[in-house]
Amino acid sequence: MIRTLRHICCLLILLAFAACSKEEPGYNPPALADRTVLLYMPGRDLEVRGAYFSNNIKSVGEAVTNWALGNGRMLVCWQPENQTSAVMQEIYYDRNKRRSETITLRTYDDFDAGDPDKVQQLFADAAELAPAQRYGLIIGCHGKAWIPASGGVLPYSLRSAAPDDDVWTTAPGAKTTRSFGDTGYELDITELAAALEVQRFRFDYLIFDDCFMANIETLYDLRHAVDYIVASPCEVMGDGFPYDRIVPHLFEGNGVLSGLEKACWEFWNLYENDWRSTIAYEQSGCISLAVTAQLDALATKMRGIKDKKQAFDINALQYYKGNVTKLFYDLEHYVTLCCSDPDAVNDFKAQMKQAFPVSCRHHTASFYSAYDRRNHSVNYYSGVSVSEPEPSARYTAENQQTNWYRDTH
């Protein structure tokens, strides 16, 4: 009888080990993580051009050590095969193998990055698959600021570009930036905001690893969706963020803002001091952080300036895009030049410090633009752009339809 019981116990132990082996030995995620971070990289263009997404994911894996995530979880959703499918994966530290590993949590065989419902469900799935007390989101792809979607990228493209329009035509032989590509799979920023706001949970922050996304029109539309937004007012080189450096900061226990502040510095440090290690081999990187709770107050200050404007030389205004149509101009510099009331300018600058902390504003001496293959000097930097001063009649009309413009005029 005792021998029989012993055999049964041994059999149960063997079955238990067999079950564990089917469930990935070394993969033991917490039932409720302290934080889940989702890196969402829609589109194929950056992968086809230079395996930039694969390099980013590899970089995340290098950051995931036995201590970096703590009680957190790191998810990656991307499209390795084609533009109509996607995978939700988790990069975790396998204590048995003593290295990071990747496991696929969910596959999407019918995915469209331009479908708001699909993107909304993807965000919901991240929380279902990796429930946590707090959440962070990184979107890495192509970006074109506030320009309404119609055949470009997530989150913005161009509505009806004329064939001879220079605005989104990159120069022959230009280096890869995260600006143009994957036409036909895009979201409007208002659609992205809605997909975020409808969730039963809230992302603390959104990091845009995309070009031109630190523009006030976009940030204002997202002010109710997340608490903090990290982005660049100009083009981001194809390499994007140094994920091996920023991921550990995103899981630190010193507060969300502290981790994001360090992430901003790491981005700048890569392109200021270690740019020779990048594929782009370009010393070009500008970054900032927006405190979305301060943007309504900033809009109020801006509204008080509309009746105090004066003529100014637009050629003296700091811009963030190459070629003829600059489109993106430094917001604070614009107010400084166009407002005739020094007190109003000072009030605006004071609110800018609340909305865009100086500790998170970093820039190289110049930025590279794929639209003319040139480097352009940064002589004034507040970290955020505005398109209101653009002299092009076409973009003036479109910009006046943005929520930022309507709420400040």
Regions found by a protein language model. Give the residues of each.
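C-terminal motif of bacterial Sec signal peptides marking the signal peptidase cleavage site
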Residues: A16-A19
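N-terminal extension/subdomain marker
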Residues: S21-A132, A397-Y405
